Amino acid sequence: MKKLVGVGLLIVGMVGGSLAAESHADQVIATILENVRKIKAVVPDAVPMAFWDFDGTIIKGDVTTGLKESGQVRYKGMAELAILNGFSPFYKGEKGAAEFMHHDYPHLRSFARWLAYPLNAQILCGSRASKIDEFCVRQFDESFASWYFSSSVRILRALEEAGVVNHILSASPELFVLAARKTLGLPADRFNGIRVAIDGGVVTERIEYPLPSEGGKTEILQRIVRSTPHGYAVAAFGNSYVIDADFLRYVVTQPPLPNGAKGTSMMINGGTPPPAFDGLFLCVEQDDVVGPAKK
């Protein structure tokens, strides 16, 4: 397969049937839009919203830590790339990147995710946010966007075309996931990641809460819905029963939506549901990506 050129422009232009996807994509699009139709029949100015995890849900792999398959690195994550390109005062060069990626971060994550996830953003302390953004946007344009799941992009674009407002809820640094805005065709204010305070254009170590992980994702979702006149959460997408299941469950068990409409939640490549979540979500497997993952 030929290398994609200008992959960002390619993805933004893909809508409806123009993007190959697994069979479940059409099913979930139809289900969500039928429920949107029910809501708008009685609330014409309703604002239907869909909420998406990012890593493993929209992109195959993890924007922060990358993707490794069968012992082969498919792409390096933004954390490693940021270190290698001088955006961290704490970790320098190949040695620093290896220390962070193979020791410090996985060790901390093994017993304290609530500390490990913010660390991915805090290592950027002292760098200019605009320079990090330029760098990360370029990574998406040149390579990361080719790892988007075809089905996820197709669903997201079809919902957006139909007037559903898509929001991102990610436990990766917001500086990383925000860089996907151009390739996904979403405005910047739809992205919610691990957020650090920016002081005079410079990244600080101060974390803003709640963290968009586990119950924090649900809290952010509810805040967005409450702040949107006639806003309704109609869909949720995730891939982890640990990180995402709470907000997915909220969407399908929330107080009744107008006119008998129901929320739809899709778990992607999540494996066997734990008993507490059995039967709640549409569980699917997907692997096809937009770009040249297979050669």
Model-found features: residue ranges?
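Sec-dependent N-terminal signal peptides
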Residues: 4-13
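Non-catalytic pre-domain segments flanking phosphatase-related domains
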Residues: 11, 17-54, 59-62, 69
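Preference for short coil/turn "hinge" residues that link or interrupt alpha-helices
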Residues: 12, 117-120, 179
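C-terminal cap/substrate-recognition subdomain and adjoining C-terminal extension
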Residues: 24-31, 42, 47-49, 129-167, ...
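Conserved cytosolic headpiece of P-type ATPases
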Residues: 53-55, 61, 65, 73-79, ...
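A metal-dependent, Asp-based hydrolase signature
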Residues: 64, 70-154
